[in-house]
UniProtKB/Swiss-Prot annotation:
Disulfide bonds: none annotated. Signal peptide: none annotated. Gene3D superfamilies: 3.40.1280.10. This is Ribosomal RNA large subunit methyltransferase H. The gene is rlmH. Belongs to the RNA methyltransferase RlmH family. Keywords: Cytoplasm, Methyltransferase, rRNA processing, S-adenosyl-L-methionine, Transferase. Homodimer. The keyword Membrane does not apply. It holds the Pfam family SPOUT_MTase. Its EC number is 2.1.1.177.
Length: 156
């Protein structure tokens, strides 16, 4: 069984975000388990020390990392894939690990400490995306790749 954990920073999400996440998570059939870990964003204001906030959020992310998972940071500077390339990449990753952990940062992204811990860095787009939407785009992309691997008609 492939486990996919998504660690993300964020506060209470709108219903449409939760609906989108749940919709794609339930589409995966037997053999793939999806888990979302949401870490509350630390409070920010105009005088916030963003470096200190990033450091604290990094500690919370590190505490949530599952043991023995392949860590993949979502980062603007990461590698991007077409749907077919992502399907191939997922096939390769399943040979390496039975647990993939995707990490989505907050408004300031991820700290260098977290990026260094990760085995890979992926980018979903060159666009700046709202962090709540990234959850849905990631799951849809993974589902599409799974559909390609399994010759499911979703991708066609």
């Amino acid at each position: 069984m492939l486990k996919i954990t998504i660690i993300t920073l964020g506060n209470k999400m709108p219903d449409w975000v939760n609906s989108g996440v749940n919709e794609y998570a339930k589409r995966f059939h037997d053999g793939i388990q999806i888990k979302l870990i949401e870490i509350p964003l630390l409070r920010r204001n105009k005088s916030s020390d963003l470096a200190r906030i990033l450091e604290k959020e990094s500690a919370l992310i590190k505490d949530a990392l599952p043991a023995n998972a392949r860590l993949i940071a979502l980062d603007m500077l990461g590698k991007s894939f077409s749907s077919e390339e992502l399907a191939l990449k997922l096939t390769q990753l399943q040979q390496i690990s039975s647990h993939l952990c995707f990490i989505i940062g907050g408004p300031e992204g991820l700290s260098n400490e977290i990026l260094t811990l990760c085995d890979e860095r992926w980018s979903l787009s060159k666009l700046t995306l709202p962090h709540p939407l990234v959850r849905i785009i990631l799951l849809e992309s993974l589902y599409r790749a799974w559909s390609i691997i399994n010759n499911h008609p979703y991708h066609k």
